[in-house]
Curated annotation (Swiss-Prot):
GO CC annotations, alphabetized: actin cytoskeleton; Arp2/3 protein complex; cytosol; extracellular exosome; focal adhesion; nucleus; tubulobulbar complex
Disease per UniProt entry: Immunodeficiency 71 with inflammatory disease and congenital thrombocytopenia: An autosomal recessive disorder characterized by platelet abnormalities, vasculitis, eosinophilia, and predisposition to inflammatory diseases.
GO biological process, one term: response to estradiol
Subcellular location field: Cytoplasm, Cytoskeleton; Nucleus
Source species, domain of life: Eukaryota
Stated name of the protein: Actin-related protein 2/3 complex subunit 1B
PANTHER family: ACTIN-RELATED PROTEIN 2/3 COMPLEX SUBUNIT 1, ACTIN-RELATED PROTEIN 2_3 COMPLEX SUBUNIT 1B
Gene source species: Homo sapiens
Name of the gene encoding the protein in the UniProt record: ARPC1B
SUPFAM superfamilies, alphabetized: WD40 repeat-like (SSF50978)
Pfam families in the record: WD40
GO molecular function terms listed in the Swiss-Prot or TrEMBL record: actin binding; protein-containing complex binding; structural constituent of cytoskeleton
Length: 372
């Protein structure tokens, strides 16, 4: 486990380049900062300044090396590296509320933007007019779209929203791709077709993720539940009410294992038993090292009561948390190995820090941890 603190400000979103030597982060404002690793240090090499509202989503296309950003100014920008400068291209999303999240499609020929306008904008490049255009997926979304993830086939798109639903839509754009082959989620996939809709839960859907095979989709809600739908089992949904505070982000690290994190400030593991169709809690992945405890003198106890409203030592803001992150984890991304067999993943948080987690090291450090 490696932790690096970039900022005093929260990191609201991040994205990595292809070879993982650079990371783009938003310091909770209208800018995007790109850091490059040199030895053990991270050095700021670029600042992307075009939005006039807070940046809410970043994604970095690995093959084309283009960055897409969206923000509360209701716009998206596609950034292209020319020489040593990132040049922005405005994408008109045709929305009247803030954009909330953005994701490149796997083939990098289009991207999706979720927004507070109760629509998903599917944007693609029109060669004839030399311009980015978008189509809207509207029905039956009834509230802000908070999270998006693409199916490996480049057509299906999972969306989590504030109307307590996880849905899968077809985002087939005939102008830029061939007709898709049938999937376990369905065979007919015209643009905007609703392929799956979860039954009502009791919370906003903060994060959504497809498995590497695309036959499973998982999501986390504000009521601290984790859900998984399996297309190979007639879209049966497994639900687990976790004991954590609400989770904000998740990712598959194998086809049967999920890592999620949120307001508890540390990642947790969930495993899926396909035979039983059940989710189970796999354990906390951030177990603190036990430090030697010594008794407090009466003087120290009264000082702590006066300064920190606590009689225990080390409970200043953030200092009392026995986790690497000292505030909510806002995003998780797979660093190496992919979703099928992840070997490293990354978390960024509202404490302005980034943690890199090694799966094998976690397995050896935690005796009861079993990643299937």
């Amino acid at each position: 486990m490696a932790y690096h603190s970039f900022l005093v400000e929260p990191i609201s979103c991040h994205a990595w380049n292809k070879d993982r030597t650079q990371i783009a982060i938003c310091p909770n404002n209208h800018e995007v900062h790109i850091y490059e690793k040199s030895g053990a240090k991270w050095t700021k090499v670029h600042e992307l300044k075009e939005h006039n509202g807070q940046v809410t989503g970043i994604d970095w296309a690995p093959e084309s090396n283009r960055i897409v950003t969206c923000g509360t100014d209701r716009n998206a920008y596609v950034w292209t590296l020319k020489g040593r400068t990132w040049k922005p291209t405005l994408v008109i999303l045709r929305i009247n509320r803030a954009a909330r999240c953005v994701r490149w499609a796997p083939n990098e020929n289009k991207f999706a933007v979720g927004s507070g306008s109760r629509v998903i904008s599917i944007c693609y490049f029109e060669q004839e007019n030399d311009w980015w255009v978008c189509k809207h997926i509207k029905k039956p979304i009834r509230s802000t779209v908070l999270s998006l993830d693409w199916h490996p086939n480049n057509v299906l798109l999972a969306a989590g929203s504030c109307d307590f639903k996880c849905r899968i839509f077809s985002a087939y754009i005939k102008e830029v791709e061939e007709r898709p082959a049938p999937t376990p989620w369905g065979s007919k996939m015209p643009f905007g077709e609703l392929m799956f809709e979860s039954s009502s839960s009791c919370g906003w859907v903060h994060g959504v993720c497809f498995s590497a095979s695309g036959s499973r989709v998982a999501w986390v809600s504000h009521d601290s539940t984790v859900c998984l739908a399996d297309a190979d089992k007639k879209m049966a949904v497994a639900t687990l009410a976790s004991e954590t505070l609400p989770l904000l982000a998740l990712t598959f690290i194998t086809d049967n294992s999920l890592v999620a994190a949120g307001h508890d400030c540390f990642p947790v593991l969930f495993t899926y038993d396909a035979a039983a169709g059940m989710l189970s809690f796999g354990g906390r992945l951030d177990v603190p090292k036990q430090s030697s405890q010594r008794g407090l003198t009466a003087r120290e106890r009264f000082q702590n009561l006066d300064k920190k409203a606590s009689s225990e030592g080390g409970t200043a803001a953030g200092a009392g948390l026995d986790s690497l992150h000292k505030n909510s984890v806002s995003q998780i991304s797979v660093l190496s190995g992919g979703k099928a067999k992840c070997s490293q993943f990354c978390t960024t948080g509202m404490d302005g820090g980034m943690s890199i987690w090694d799966v094998k090291s976690l397995e050896s450090a935690l005796k009861d941890l079993k990643i299937k």
